[in-house]
């Protein structure tokens, strides 16, 4: 990501409510690549993903009720600097596109896959043209596809929040759909991601505040959940991993983003946020991508880079987090100023 990112100018009401959130983000563990980029003019943004090339971003806009079949959902496309290049790059009701309430997305090669109620749709990421439509079995009532994860081997996984199910899709076999797991313990699976080490599925629960691990054959294990006397999580929405294997989870109701480090320590890296939905991580540019569902905006911000130069016991400075520049290094002897 280039360092001369230009901050979007917010409309007055949003600017007043949003600036304090940015301050909290900066002070709780995120760094700023030049300037944090804010994106406005959205409509109920749900998911924010990056092209693996690091040259483009996409935001899904529900534009109405999350279960409405109104054919007015759209996808916003941004360039490498986070500037909107096409607000309605893909739009329901235009050019025979049927797109009701687009939620989770995943990029695989040239195809942008989008979860839309009871169908998975694939569009060409360059032209925006529809490439494939995948329908799902209706064995479980209340089909509500929520998020998508792409595995390294080419398989896709889709969460179904209403049916407490996870589906596996094989694009190489004509996008065949198989039910991977149907279990009430999923408790409304929302965001899903692939664990970078185990290649297991990780999903977060909307209803019970759980984080669950799912093996390739559908075996469930609870990684984290609320205790009897504690309510750490409420309505978990998004989950993703950075390039070092740290996990990030968003709670849309509590307005928090959590980080779970590789040694299973939890940290709140941002709070008092206005409904952070299905977050994404740009692992190429080390950025967190946050859609703010109820204020119709989104944000790109830098993540802390782990430092191996300091021991765990050594105090870290603001420079380690990127908030202030580090002190200048002494110049070699004989160098003229």
Report each predicted region and the residues it spans.
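A short beta-strand motif characteristic of beta-propeller blades
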Residues: 35-38, 85-95, 131-138, 176-182, ...
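Beta-rich, blade/repeat-based domains predominating
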Residues: 42-54, 65, 93-109, 138-156, ...
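Short glycine/acidic-enriched loop and turn motifs that connect beta-strands
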Residues: 63-67, 119, 163-164, 208-209, ...
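Blade-level signature of beta-propeller repeat domains, shared across WD40, Kelch, NHL, RCC1
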Residues: 280-324
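Short loop/turn segments that connect beta-strands within beta-propeller blades
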Residues: 79-82, 124-128, 170-174, 215-219, ...
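Residue position within the beta-strands of beta-propeller blades
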Residues: 58-60, 114, 158, 203, ...
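WD40 beta-propeller blade core
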Residues: 76, 121-122, 167, 212, ...
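Beta-propeller domains
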Residues: 61-83
């Amino acid at each position: 990501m280039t360092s001369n990112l230009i901050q979007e100018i917010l409309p007055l009401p949003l600017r007043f409510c949003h600036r304090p959130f940015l301050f909290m983000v900066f002070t709780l563990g995120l760094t700023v690549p030049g300037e944090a980029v804010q994106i406005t003019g959205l409509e109920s943004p749900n998911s924010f993903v990056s092209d693996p090339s690091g040259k483009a971003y996409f935001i899904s806009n529900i534009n109405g009720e999350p279960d409405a079949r109104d054919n007015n959902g759209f996808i916003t496309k941004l360039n490498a600097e986070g500037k909107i290049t096409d607000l309605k790059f893909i739009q329901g009701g235009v050019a025979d596109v049927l797109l009701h309430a687009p939620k989770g997305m995943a990029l695989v090669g040239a195809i942008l896959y989008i979860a839309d109620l009871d169908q998975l749709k694939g569009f060409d990421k360059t032209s925006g043209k529809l490439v494939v439509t995948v329908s799902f079995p209706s064995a479980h009532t209340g089909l509500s596809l929520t998020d998508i994860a792409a595995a390294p081997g080419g398989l896709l996984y889709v969460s179904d929040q209403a049916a407490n199910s996870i589906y596996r899709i094989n694009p190489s076999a004509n996008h065949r759909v198989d039910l991977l797991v149907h279990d009430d313990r999923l408790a409304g699976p929302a965001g899903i991601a692939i664990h970078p080490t185990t290649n297991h599925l990780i999903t977060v629960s909307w209803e019970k505040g759980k984080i669950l691990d799912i093996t390739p054959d559908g075996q469930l294990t609870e990684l984290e959940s609320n205790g009897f006397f504690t309510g750490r999580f409420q309505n978990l929405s998004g989950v993703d991993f950075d390039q070092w294997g740290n996990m990030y989870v968003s709670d849309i109701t509590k307005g928090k983003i959590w980080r779970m480090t590789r040694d299973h320590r939890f940290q709140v890296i941002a709070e008092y946020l206005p409904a952070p939905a299905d977050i994404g991580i740009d692992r190429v540019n080390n950025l967190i991508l946050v859609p703010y569902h109820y204020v119709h905006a989104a944000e790109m911000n830098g993540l802390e880079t782990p430092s191996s130069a300091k021991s765990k016991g050594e105090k870290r400075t603001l420079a380690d987090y990127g908030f202030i520049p580090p002190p200048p290094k002494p110049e070699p002897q004989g160098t003229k100023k």
